[in-house]
Design a protein with these regions (language model features):
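Short, Lys/Arg-rich, polar N-terminal cytosolic tail immediately upstream
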Residues: 1-13
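Membrane-interfacial loop-to-transmembrane alpha-helix junctions, especially the N-terminal start
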Residues: 17-19, 75-88, 215-225
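Alpha-helical transmembrane segments of multi-pass integral membrane proteins
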Residues: 20-31, 91-96, 112-131, 142-169, ...
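A loop-to-helix transmembrane entry motif
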Residues: 49-56, 180-201
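Hydrophobic cores of alpha-helical transmembrane segments in multi-pass inner/ER membrane proteins
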Residues: 58-69, 115-129, 196-204, 258-273
Length: 288
C-alpha cells in the first residue's frame, strides 16, 4: 500500500538517498561542533574564521535537527518534507564545496570532503527519483506561480549584478576583489558556485514555473528552502562578526532579513498549495 501511494509522485522510491541523511548528520555534527567548541581551530583569516563559526552555530543548532525531521517525514511519504530535505541538501552541498575548496587545510579536511560527497549524491539521487509530471498534478490552482517565479528571477538577476559589479572591474584592472582579500583565498567560491550553479538554477526554475511546466513545480520548493537556510546562515555569520567587533552593515542585514522573510512566506504558501491525498495521510499515520 505504501509503495502504491508513494508511486504517484516518485518514479522509484530508493531510500538509499534518504539514508545518506544519517552519515550527513553525523559528519555535520562533528564539523560544526569542532568549529564551535575548539576556539582558534580555523587557520583562515579572522574575517573568514568568524563567518565559519557563525555558520557552524547555525548548522549545529538548526540544520542538524531540521534535516533529521525532514528525512523522517519524507520517509513517511511526505512530499512537503521531501522538498525541504532537498533544499537543505542543496545548502549542504553548496556549503561544504566551499569548505573543501576554500578553507585552509585543517584536521577536518576529510570530513568536509565526505560531507560534500554525501550531500552531492543525496541531491542527485533525490532529484533523479522524482516524477516531475506526477508532482505537478499534486498542486492546486492556489499555487503562487507568478509570485515565486518573479521573486526567484529577480533575486537571480540582482545577485548576478552584485557579483559582476565586484568581479568585472577587478578583471579589467588586474586587481583582486575585496571579498577575496578579506577571505584570504585564491578566489571567492561563492562567486563561482552562485554564478555557475545557484543563480542559473533560480532562473531555470523561474522561467519553467512561469510557464507552468513540471520542472518549475519540482524545483521551486527545494530552491526556496535553500534560500531560507542560506539567508539564515548569512545572518548568523553577520552576528558572529558583529560580536567580534566588526561593524554591522545595516542595509545588508535588512536585505537578508527581507530575503529570509519573503522566501519563508513563499515556501509556506507553496507547500500549503500541495494536495495531500487521503491515502497519503492514512499511510503517514500508519507509519507513525
Amino acid at each position: 500500500m505504501w509503495l502504491k501511494t508513494a508511486h504517484r509522485f516518485i518514479e522509484r522510491r530508493d531510500d538509499a538517498w534518504l539514508r545518506l541523511t544519517l552519515p550527513i548528520i553525523g559528519l555535520l555534527a562533528i564539523a560544526s561542533g569542532v568549529g564551535i567548541f575548539f576556539k582558534g581551530f580555523y587557520r583562515d583569516t579572522t574575517y573568514y574564521s568568524l563567518m565559519a563559526v557563525g555558520q557552524d552555530f547555525f548548522s549545529f543548532i538548526v540544520v542538524v535537527p531540521t534535516l533529521a525531521i525532514a528525512a523522517l517525514m519524507a520517509h513517511r511519504s511526505s512530499l512537503r518534507a521531501l522538498f525541504v530535505w532537498l533544499g537543505i541538501v542543496i545548502y549542504l552541498t553548496y556549503t561544504y564545496a566551499i569548505a573543501a575548496f576554500d578553507n585552509q587545510f585543517n584536521a577536518l579536511f576529510l570530513v568536509y570532503v565526505a560531507l560534500f560527497a554525501c550531500s552531492l549524491y543525496a541531491l542527485i539521487g533525490g532529484f533523479l527519483g522524482l516524477n516531475k509530471d506526477g508532482i505537478k498534478a499534486r498542486f492546486t490552482e492556489r499555487t503562487p506561480v507568478r509570485a515565486i517565479s518573479l521573486y526567484l528571477g529577480t533575486l537571480a538577476v540582482l545577485f548576478y549584478l552584485t557579483w559582476l559589479r565586484e568581479v568585472i572591474p577587478a578583471v579589467l584592472t588586474g586587481t583582486v576583489p575585496q571579498s577575496v582579500k578579506d577571505s584570504g583565498t585564491p578566489t571567492n567560491a561563492v562567486h563561482v558556485l552562485d554564478m555557475s550553479w545557484i543563480l542559473p538554477a533560480l532562473l531555470i526554475t523561474a522561467v519553467n514555473l512561469r510557464h507552468r511546466r513540471s520542472l518549475g513545480y519540482l524545483l521551486a520548493g527545494p530552491m526556496l528552502s535553500f534560500i531560507v537556510f542560506m539567508a539564515s546562515a548569512v545572518l548568523c555569520m553577520v552576528i558572529s562578526m558583529s560580536r567580534a567587533g566588526y561593524p554591522l552593515v545595516v542595509p545588508q542585514v535588512i536585505l537578508f532579513i527581507a530575503t529570509l522573510a519573503v522566501s519563508l512566506g513563499l515556501l509556506i504558501w507553496y507547500l500549503r498549495s500541495l494536495r495531500v491525498a487521503a491515502a497519503d495521510a492514512d499511510e503517514s499515520q500508519r507509519c507513525a
